[in-house]
Amino acid sequence: VGFLALAYPDAKFFYSKRDARATCWSNYETAFAEGNFYSHRLEDIVDHYNRCTRLMQFWVDLFPSQIYTFDYEKFVSSPTIYGPDLFNFLNLDWSPFYLEVSRSTTEVTTASQFQVKEKIYSGSSDQWKNFILRIGTRFSNLIE
């Protein structure tokens, strides 16, 4: 981020934040490609999440006018408000059609390949709560 922000002072960056517990649980449930061994243990995921969060906060503090912190929960609850805000930050035109992701025929090859073909919804952010007994205190050190 730093090199790009300095090399391209007009560059804009999009930083998507989601509930820390939902993010960590989603990582735990996902079978990532080889080399992502941190995602096999909740303790390692929490450590990885915290390191990423601290690093991103460093960049946000250093380049506040170039980095847009996008609140995932706010977006899924009010996409017609928060979608246009992001596009405005990026100096792009907004269209309500962008919210009709379930109509897209574009191939998706990410861990979210099935979810992105559905309508925007907020239910996945609470899935971790179904496993609270299994999770125990593993999320107690999370940075929000």
Identify the role of each PLM range:
Residues 27-69, 77-144:
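PAPS-dependent sulfotransferases, especially Golgi type II membrane carbohydrate sulfotransferases
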Residues 4-28, 86:
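Conserved phosphate-donor/acceptor-positioning beta-strand/loop module used by diverse small-molecule
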Residues 1:
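Conserved adenosine/adenylate-binding substructure
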